[in-house]
Amino acid sequence: MAESETVLVTGGTGFIGSYVAEDLVEAGHDVVAYDLSTDDRILEKLGVADDVEVVRGDITDPTSVFRAVTESGATRIVHLAALLTTLARDNPRSAVEVNVMGTNNVFEAARSLDQVQRVAWASSAAVYAPPANYDGDWVDEEDLVYPDTLYGATKEYNEHQAKVYFEDHDVSHVGLRPTVAYGPYRETGGSAFLANIVEKPALGESFAVEYGDQVIDWQYVRDIAQAFRKAAFAPEEDLSQRIYNVRGEVATIREAAETVARIVPDADIEVSDEGELPWTQMLDMTDAQEDLGYDPEFGLETGFREYIDVLRAEEGLEPLQ
């Protein structure tokens, strides 16, 4: 294991941020969660609220970011704070301020403060063009980047500014391109149906879902957390590049529904093949496996089982064997 270090996690009280904090704590590191929200509900549910220092701050305020990095003594930053797809679309100016200038504040802090050895940060599979551009093939980091959302555009810009900070200012960084994370305590959003396909049957509710024959990357949140830790600590000499695809298990919506039905025998899920999803899901993650040692631990069934048991426990229901 790497020696214990202090890691600042921006967006650290959010869904993915809380799991990243938990993962880092379990790996023996000191964690500071930097976020506009000091609601540690998810950290509490994960059992690490007492082990994580929560610092309230605004990622768009450079003074606030510098102060948090300096006062925490952080040697690594995991930068997750962002406005996601739907919020970005509805609040375009804020999306640019948070996603682009907020990221710039993080890179500026890393450039100015010698203590910071690495910034691991969230890009997104949203930087890729819509799926029709790839002829159903696996997509790797060399393929066409042409986002059709503002969110994706901010992430693409961040890949460019990260490159500049690395080449011109020697700021060590690793950016990851995850798709959509699923797991307990996810906030609802544009991909809420991905949560409902598990959550509703787990609690005995019926659910109807479209897109049955379309492929989704089912990426369990604990695997994404593992990926960010490895991105933060991978030795420089192991990195063949700076931006990596990461994914979980690729399966159709119908296959996911069938998996839920195996776990929850009385699940009432109706699946149709209507509609078309606008995301590129088939990410080749060979480079992340080779360079970062990224190795997803949760397949569809194991991820769904843990997710369902947590949901049922929350509702006072028995776990499913």
Predicted ranges, named:
Residues I59-V98:
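NAD(P)H-binding glycine-rich loop region in Rossmannoid oxidoreductase-like domains
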Residues Y146-V174:
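Active-site Tyr-X1-5-Lys
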Residues V7-A27:
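N-terminal Rossmann NAD(P)H-binding glycine-rich loop of SDR-like oxidoreductase domains
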Residues T13, K163-I216, V221-A225:
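NAD(P)-dependent short-chain dehydrogenase/reductase
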Residues V48-T60:
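Rossmann-fold cofactor-recognition segment
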Residues E210-D213, D217-Q321:
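C-terminal substrate-binding subdomain of Rossmann-fold SDR/epimerase-dehydratase oxidoreductases
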Residues N104-L150:
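Conserved Rossmann-fold NAD(P)-dependent oxidoreductase catalytic core, especially the SDR/UDP-sugar
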Residues H29-D40:
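Conserved glycine-rich Rossmann-like NAD(P)H-binding loop of the short-chain dehydrogenase/reductase
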